[in-house]
Structures are given as C-alpha cells and as structure tokens.
Amino acid sequence: LVLIERGGSPRPIDDYITDAPNGLNWVKIGDAPEQGRYITKTVEKIKPEGLSKTRQVQPGDLILSNSMSFGKPYIMGINGCIHDGWLLIRDTQSRFDLKFLCHMLGTEQMLNQYRMFAAGSTVNNLNKELVGNTTVSLPSIEEQRVIGDYLENIDHLITLHQRKLFE
C-alpha cells in the first residue's frame, strides 16, 4: 500500500557536511522533536554532491526511525535527506491520511509487531521488509481524516500543557 525505502549516507559523512546556503537538510535522529510529529529543521546540511548516496525526502513524507530508538514516526515539514537510520514511507496511492498513518505507526500495537519481527537481532533494527510485513487496520479515508485530526489536536493540547508546566 505504501512505498518503503531505506535512507543512505555518503561516506565519509564528514566530507559532505557543509554550511553552504545550497546545502541539503541532513535529517538526523536528534532533529526529531521530543514533542510533536513534524520535522521542521535540521542542525546539519550536506553538499548536493552527496545526494546520489542518500534518500531525498520532501514535505508530507513520513519517516520512521529504524535503529536503536526504532519505530518512531515523523512527518517531514521540510525538504531534506535521510541516512540509513531512517525509513521513508511514501503513500504513492493516496490510501492514507498522513496524520492518521503517522499516529498509527507509533502505536504500541505497531511497536509490538516491530519487536516481534526484529526479534533475534542483537540490536533491534527495522528494515523495509519487516515494516512492509506489518498488519494495519484501515478505516475509510474519511474516517482516517477525522481520527488523524482528533489525535493531532490532542498532541497539540499536550504540548501546550507541557510548555505551561516548564514556564
């Protein structure tokens, strides 16, 4: 139902890191927000010459962490490139509401499937085959939109309350 592709890294990566204005956003796990689901900025950029060795992502793409803290989904709010610690999940058939899919991929039910499929590895890693073998419940697109909007509103309220706690 979706296209799943692994990120990649030009090597050695230090040769490709740049501060140049034409640099491409280099999405790292540390760029993912602690609260929220949208990646809107990166700390580092890579040179355009590294593009052939990585995976380009665009606003509206969904990415999923696939190693160490695996199974955390995020929605891209910017153009960028992902390394091999991420999987790109692109809805090429318009079967999913993006917010719904992002929330669904981060549920305990999905994490349990990821753990089951990754069992036996020294380090739990996901790959596109493992993620592609997961089972998802798929309500109508209209129902997905309602659920996705509802869950995003709850996330927004939680973030606002947490900010107030730390003021």
Task: Identify the role of each PLM range.
Residues 18-35:
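Short beta-strand/loop turn elements enriched in aromatics
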Residues 104-136:
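Specificity-determining recognition surfaces
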Residues 35-39, 124-126:
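Short acidic/His/Gly/Ser-rich catalytic and metal-binding motifs that mark active-site loops
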Residues 28-30, 37-108:
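A short beta-sheet element
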Residues 1-10, 35, 133:
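Non-catalytic DNA-recognition/assembly elements of restriction-modification systems
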Residues 85-87, 130-134, 154:
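Short amphipathic alpha-helical segments
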Residues 101, 135-167:
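Amphipathic alpha-helical segments
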Residues 11-18, 117:
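Short coil/turn segments at secondary-structure boundaries
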